């Protein structure tokens, strides 16, 4: 796909830029607004918004209008805007959501783009983050802004090691919170409970050691009570299983494999919520996702000796 900046269309703020997105042959796909810098009255964080979702009317594709909004530091008079690696990953992430909206090709607007089950919506965004960290891709953008020197290999290796740091703890506390969420939402009767006692019993049930607690305790677990993740907090790590397994299709061939990219586009990005997510995924990948790529990415695939008690 190709991007061409549009200068003759309305913008909600002067900081925003507007781009027409087309196929290689020039066929119109949609319009993308990009709004990268913080300002007064703009909330923090980063997100993708669909101003107009795609639909098909009388056989004609009604193109979407999508935006990516971030809060990257503005360039100064003497230097461009320099991004941290986390900020780069954020952009790749939101760009994945944008592609999901821009490449949608369905009949009904209510099923377009990111209108999919919550535990599937992060696949297009999270898979993009994998490319951001690949040495082949880093060499394209991670350069010294004055000299043009490409990021040193030693620094790339440190970046890779940092990605697995403390993942045992991080994964365990997350899974504990996910299982606590499911325990709360698996109750079949109206009951009054002591939140701390309920949580303690739930953690004992799964065998969580006392030195690790759930990422969110019951008394401030907003995600599952008012944040839209009721019985769905697990979706973050499930999306991790999906995105790492999906990325293997490229990692084991070439990072820019056009055949695999075409399969991903036609069976995931274009289809929105028109079919069961696992049906779409298997059509792309040829099989159900494996957990092994996620374990490798987190450095948790290595077999280790069990801890032994120390006398004394």
Question: What is the meaning of each model-derived region?
Answer:
Residues 1-312:
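Cation-handling catalytic/transport regions enriched in His/Asp/Glu
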